[in-house]
Amino acid sequence: MALAKIVYASMTGNTEEIADIVASKLEELGLEVQVHECTTIETEEILDADLIVVASYTYSYGGDGELPDEIVDFYADLADLDLTGKVYGVCGSGDTFYDDFCSAVDDFDVMLGSRGATKGAENVKVDLAAEDEDIVNLEQFATDLVAKVNE
């Protein structure tokens, strides 16, 4: 059974809910899933996963989209890992009020791809909290990831 590790950062609970939606669908599709809040996992612990999912909100103090403080170390440590042979997906929440809507999702997409991992699904960006359409998109995201893992 393939192992998926989901690492998330959530301030308001919205991104944690996103991670839980993805985790539920991955489990339904037959993967073993471990969900970790980003401060409770060392970055190298993702190396035993077949699928890596990062879910992060974008912090926009003053309108400048930034990675949340609590996930910065995880992000920086990714630069030291070889993720060749791993499949990844990135999702997260943000606020469309800001020009940099969900830029943390884009940052993680670039980083994971640059470390040799294979993108398994298009990024999913959620405006604030997951609504019905977002849930459909997140479940499709999970389905696409499993298809890539099973190739």
Language model segments and positions:
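Short acidic loop-to-helix transition motifs that present clustered carboxylates
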Residues: 36-42
